[in-house]
Structure formats: structure tokens, C-alpha cells
């Protein structure tokens, strides 16, 4: 059996237009479901940390602990280091407990039972073998510690008015068809965890929703995805001519939707918090 690939999402290299659509993520916008489990002395591991904007938001919650972000891409780690240098809260409060490591989610460079909190955000959705990844996340978690995972469920996406739905969801569909993204990761999380030998009664499952509807958020999300569809290396079709035509069509649809006061886009994320048996 071939070894699973770490980085399907950036298989063709890190793309700044894709990374920008991830850079708005922070613990406060994306990880509130797990913050109540965090203690000020905890060691947190953020696996698949991407551009690091969630990772660098954790240190203020663990001023007496430590935060480490892990990525298999040095290019993304460079972006994460830049995010760390820019984090004003850490400078102001003189917190210096965050670092980054190159590593694979399938073989994390840490001993067993090392971290109090092990976190992933929109990582398993892109993996060939999420169950193997969950086994490894649990391995490095201390007994009594927590594995926290949040993953999008792309098939839950809804767009209104209906006239925009097909074109606005073409990017998600292309990630499913061409880039290996799992369309039902959010709803699969609990099942994957049980397949990874997590104890069922120790898994707390929940869900949250992204909603882009008011004028400000429509403008913001449209700008990000128009730039992404026009300029990133994320293809919509294998045929060059069709790809260019679809890119233009999707960008125009985002522009029209942005200006439509009826516009609404929402999607569900599945979430699990697993307490490792002591």
C-alpha cells in the first residue's frame, strides 16, 4: 500500500491566493468550541497550521504553557513565522511561547503523551487517510488531554438566491473532483474517530455554521474568492480553455452575488473534542 500524501491541498506548491482565504482564521473566529478546555499551563499542538493565524492566537490562552504549530510545507511555515512576528498581543504582553516545526501529521516529531491539547482545523478534509492521522493525533496527546478537530462539510453549502448557487459552488466542486477534498468530512468526523479506536463515550460532537449575508461580509468573502478563482493555481477544469472560461464565469457570479442584498451563503462544520482515556 502506498504511503498517504501529507499535502494534497498544496500539492503544486503554496499558493498565496489560497493561503489568503485562510488567513482570517483565528481561535476566536474558528475555535471557540474548544477554548473552554484550554488551561493557562497547557501545551498545545496545532497540526496542519497553515499560515499560522490560529496558532499565534493560542499563546495568550496559555501564558504559562507552550504552543507549537506543525506543517509539512516550509513555505507555509515561513508565512506562519511572519504571522507570529506580527502578533501585537504577544508583543504587548511579552509572551514568547510559540514556535513552528516541519512535520507530517502521519508521523509527528514528538514522543507519546506530549500535549494537553492537539488541534486541527480544516486539515482532515484534505487527507487521503484521516483515520491514520487521528491515530497519530491521539498518540501525542497526554492521558486526560484533548484532541480537537473541526472540518467543513462541503455538501452542506447553501447559496441564495438560487441563480448564483451553481457558479459559486464550482470552486468547492473542483476541490472535490480534482484536488482530493472530502465533501462530507464534517459529518464523517465522529465515524473516523471511532475507526481510529477513539472511545465513543469520550467523543463530544458538535457543529457550527459559517454565514456570509450582510453587505460587509458579502464584500469581504467575495473579494477573497474572486482573487482566488482568477489568480490561484487551483484549477476548475483539466482543459485549459474550459478552465479559463469557468474562472471568469465564477468571478462574475461572485461579483453579482456580492451586490445582491438578498445574498446569503452558509456551510456547516463538524467538530469533535475527544478526551483521551487516562
Curated annotation (Swiss-Prot):
Probable methyltransferase. The keyword Nucleotide-binding does not apply. CDD domains: AdoMet_MTases. The keyword Methyltransferase applies. Keywords: Cytoplasm, Methyltransferase, Nucleus, Transferase. It is found in: Cytoplasm; Nucleus. One of its GO terms (molecular function) is S-adenosylmethionine-dependent methyltransferase activity. Its main location: cytoplasm. One of its GO terms (biological process) is methylation. GO terms for cellular component: cytosol; nucleus. Its EC number is 2.1.1.-. InterPro entries: Methyltransf_11, SAM-dependent_MTases_sf. This is Uncharacterized methyltransferase C1B3.06c. It comes from the Eukaryota. It comes from Schizosaccharomyces pombe (strain 972 / ATCC 24843).
